[in-house]
């Protein structure tokens, strides 16, 4: 798998009106990035759901402290929770597990949606392969990536850097905007003669261009790999009848299909996934 053809753009459409609903829903509520996507996916499939309902089902536990320290530059806190959320006794017991997010999506959908968890292995080529297989097998799917943002490029690089990367030229990566565990979605990829960029859809309009940013496939792979003793991965969410076929294609491509440990096992302890 050598990546997309030069000049090609591959997109994952997601469910109907997903991009519009995303634009309306931003920004996420504080510390509910995983629940943000769960609620958005469920709502797009006709099951109107709030971030809090998904978070409670996922076992999310909030960390105490000043939320400004967990936000990307320019973002402001949003703590308008509709219910009382559980708060951890200490930072090490706060967070949201990817398994919890998957469970909440499947259970709250009444079994109409399925989640295929992909735990790696991660490389630039495998990220591109995941996008292409998902788009071909389940074009209405949503790829929810759980990663470490500190390995990504800054979300608003000069256009020349993106073009140089696509041409295969060596560039100096812009510093990341922030560094934390996070959930976002993969919306597609762009291919050039010397490289590829992944289209990411984020939870804050301050990141990139109204929440969208382009990242080298290798940077996304590093962010999924994390390098901090925790694991990352992608929750491939689609209609339940498509999940089996998607899992089969991904398994044939040597992906590891299992849930991963991001440091927050079912919200009981671990990493703060913003």
Language model segments and positions:
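Cysteine-nucleophile protease catalytic domains, especially the papain-like/related folds used
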Residues: 2-141, 230-231, 238-267
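Noncatalytic regulatory segments and standalone regulatory/sensor domains
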Residues: 167-181, 188-274
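Active-site-adjacent substructure of cysteine-protease-like catalytic cores
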Residues: 124-201
């Amino acid at each position: 798998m050598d990546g997309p053809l030069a000049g090609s753009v591959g997109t994952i459409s997601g469910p109907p009106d997903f991009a519009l609903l995303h634009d309306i829903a931003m920004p996420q509520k504080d510390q509910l990035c995983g629940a943000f996507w769960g609620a958005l996916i469920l709502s797009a499939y006709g099951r109107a759901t709030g971030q809090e309902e998904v978070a409670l089902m996922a076992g999310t536990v909030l960390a105490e402290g000043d939320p400004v320290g967990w936000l990307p530059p320019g973002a402001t806190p949003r703590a308008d929770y509709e219910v009382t959320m559980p708060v951890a006794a200490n930072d090490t017991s706060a967070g949201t597990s990817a398994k919890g997010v998957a469970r909440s999506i499947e259970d709250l959908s009444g079994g109409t949606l399925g989640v295929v968890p992909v735990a790696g292995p991660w490389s630039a080529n495998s990220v591109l392969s995941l996008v292409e297989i998902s788009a071909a097998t389940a074009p209405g799917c949503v790829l929810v990536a759980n990663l470490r943002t500190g390995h990504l490029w800054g979300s608003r690089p000069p256009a020349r850097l993106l073009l140089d990367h696509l041409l295969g030229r060596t560039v100096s990566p812009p510093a990341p905007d922030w560094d934390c565990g996070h959930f976002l979605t993969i919306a597609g990829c762009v291919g050039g003669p010397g490289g590829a960029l992944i289209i990411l859809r984020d939870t804050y309009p301050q990141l990139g261009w109204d929440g969208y940013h382009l990242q080298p496939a290798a940077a996304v792979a590093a962010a999924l790999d994390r390098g901090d003793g925790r694991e990352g991965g992608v929750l491939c969410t689609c209609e339940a009848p498509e999940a089996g076929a998607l899992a089969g294609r991904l398994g044939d491509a040597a992906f590891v299909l299992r849930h991963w440990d991001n440091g927050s096992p079912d919200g009981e302890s671990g990493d703060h996934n913003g």
